[in-house]
Amino acid sequence: MFNPHALDSPAVIFDNGSGLCKAGLSGEFGPRHIVSSIVGHLKFQAPSAGANQKKYFVGEEALYKLEALQLHSPIERGLITGWDDMERLWKHLFEWELGVKPSDQPLLATEPSLNPRENREKMAEVMFENFGVPAFYLSDQAVLALYASACVTGLVVDSGDGVTCTVPIFEGYSLPHAVTKLHVAGRDITELLTQLLLASGHTFSCELDKGLVDDIKKKLCYVALEPEKELSRRPEEVLREYKLPDGNIISLGDPLCQAPEALFAPQQLGCQSPGLSHMVSSSITKCDADIQKILFGEIVLSGGTTLFHGLDDRLLKELEQLASKDTPIKITAPPDRWFSTWIGASIVTSLSSFKQMWVTAADFKEFGSSVVQRRCF
């Protein structure tokens, strides 16, 4: 039975990403809990295992026990592909991270641009039928990131762990015909950096696992303004030091700018899609001529993979060459952009006017899962 008073409670927010899921409550400044989007299942069930033995592990606990587990990523390239594991991850967030009963509070979940219809309806079914939420809403990650910058019209460049996309938004609505996606993002840059480091001739005193290379990437990688010039600089000009977990210090050079270069030149990963600057230009030129100038003047970066030092300057430089002469271009790079989407969700669910937006359990019962197609856009 739908309880209308549940809409007065702070909403639960799940920002579902390929690499991280961020969970928290409406009205707060940031997510309370951030977990890796990983579910691990035991490779072998001990014969003496009792009924209480855990069958699966989520997030960091799964990564910690990875030797004994088979790891699964329920979100691939931004899209949910493993629904059973996704449900386990959400259950973990509700019960163990937030400590809330799903039936007590409304839930806003984020979704990627161009999320397929079947995925949207499946999520509504899982939330209403399996978790018993009183109300639910699905919101575009790029639109929420734009809200976090106090804008309703602009172009969002969103790059996380699994996918990079450019999303034009007009008065709070994304323009799907002009969305551009690239399957090169954080995890691809980490893999490329690993290959480059191994090929560089360095000897590493400890294993180059994903966690270590991720840390090197986040602390030292950068985007060069002029990549050819950067590679011709003297080694001592580009070398940066990194302290390994065993205390040894190594000096790293060219790979630090070569790996993020894949965002601007995906061809180096065998991907024939255009790079970031051309994606932005292409998305904007697919929009109505009347709003193209506005979009060039309000480009907002979102997602952890846009945090590379120099990325905004390089994007601006290349867009100035691609845009028509005298087009004003402004790129906003919020410092907290790795969770901009979550902040936007916290803002919109705090508005009193949002109460009428919720798809309630009664709506779901009356109209079925297709109700999200009409109500969440």
UniProtKB/Swiss-Prot annotation:
SMART domains: ACTIN. InterPro entries: Actin (IPR004000), Actin/actin-like_CS (IPR020902), ATPase_NBD (IPR043129). Belongs to the actin family. SUPFAM superfamilies: Actin-like ATPase domain. Pfam families: Actin. Its main location: cytoplasm. GO terms for cellular component: cytoplasm; cytoskeleton. It comes from the Eukaryota. This is Actin-related protein T2. The keyword Cytoplasm applies. PROSITE patterns: ACTINS_ACT_LIKE. Keywords: Cytoplasm, Cytoskeleton. Disulfide bonds: none annotated. It is found in: Cytoplasm, Cytoskeleton. Gene3D superfamilies: 3.30.420.40, Actin, Chain A, domain 4. It comes from Macaca fascicularis (Crab-eating macaque).
